[in-house]
Every structure is written in structure tokens, then in C-alpha cells.
From Swiss-Prot:
Record gene name: syd
Name of the protein in question: Protein Syd
Purpose: Interacts with the SecY protein in vivo. May bind preferentially to an uncomplexed state of SecY, thus functioning either as a chelating agent for excess SecY in the cell or as a regulatory factor that negatively controls the translocase function.
Chief site of localization: membrane
Source organism phylogeny: Bacteria, Pseudomonadati, Pseudomonadota, Gammaproteobacteria, Alteromonadales
InterPro entries: Syd (IPR009948), Syd_sf (IPR038228)
HAMAP family with a match to the protein in the record: Syd
Domain of life: Bacteria
UniProt keyword annotation of Amino-acid biosynthesis present: no
Membrane topology, record value: Peripheral membrane protein
Amino acid sequence: MSSLPALDLFLSKYQQAYVDQLGEQPRYYAQEQESDCVVGEMDSDGAVFWQGVVRDNPGQFENVESALELTLCPEINTFYGRHFSAPLFFDSKWGSGELIQVWNQTDFEYLQQNIIGHLMMKKKLKQEPTWFIGVLDDEDKMLTVNNADGSVWVEIPGELQSTKLAESLDEFISLLTPRVMPPVKPIEESMPELDHPGIWQRMKLMWNNLRGK
């Protein structure tokens, strides 16, 4: 598995930042989804304290590669398959945003389906393959990795990558600062398929808007 030391370091700094500023570990509205990340009991508001953990059995993307007949940049296995974690909020010189992570194995499988959907959309649009790692808070800007060379870019759904942020995923993560903030309650959606915690709702709304164009 490819190594992303910056991700391990960021997770460590993330946990410590919450302890230093709030005197507690970060909290997350997991909507009663179990995870090895959970520390203690759910609070009265429905949030859980959590801590990122290294998976006993790392997640892999061979099934996605086989389904699409495409070789993925190896960093995808480390970024999404090494840990279980809640989404990670950050500040950067490009603004604030979130990095996607997976909460449990079911979440990982859900992620793979979305990666496949994203790559199929890129193929349909006759664009080079990319895969997403998060979003910026500025409107509908995704953070994506160029599958050919591993560089990190800003991408708006349906368009080509527009602004290059770093030569590699490890370099990009090393430029981020953990953002300490209260847990964000998921927005209630009327469609059952959108009922998923946190960042996924934003990602799905972006793609739904694209399909509606």
C-alpha cells in the first residue's frame, strides 16, 4: 500500500487540536452508525466522540479497477483504506473545507459506489479520470486527484480540473491545518438515498445538480 505520512500526521494533529482548544475529542453525528472510531457513549444531542483508527484490514480498490478496467493512482488505497475516521475539517490558503474519510466498512463500500459513479461521469463527458477527496466550503468546488499523475486540483462537477493545488496528495495534506468546530448535524433530506451523514450530502447534491443540467 502506498504511504501517505501526511495523513497520519494530520489525523494526530486533528485529535490534539480538539483536546487543546476544547478539552475533548472531536464529535460527530453518526446517525447511530457503528464504528471502531467511537469513544464512549452518544451524548444527549445524538453526537459521539470519536478518534481515527488504523483499520485491521485495509480497504482496497481492486474491485473498482476491475469494474472500470482502469488502474487507479495507488494513493487512493491509503487515503480511503488505511483509517476509519469522520470527515476532517481544515483551513488552508485556499479556504476552509473537508476531507472525506470513511466511518466503517459499509461507508467504504458506499464510497466505492460513488467513486465509480464519478469516474463513469468523467468517461461520459470524455474527460480524464479523477477521484474526489473532499470539498471546499466555497460553493460547489470539489477537491480531486488527477489519476494520471497524482496531483491535487479544484474541480467543479461536470467540468475539467481548474486550479492545481499541489503536486501530490501527500503534499496537499501537509499544507492543511485542522479546523476545530462543533459537530455539524446532517441536513434532513426528503429522498432516502440522500440520508447519509455529513459531507456525502453535499457531494450528492452537486452531482444531482449536474445531472439536472
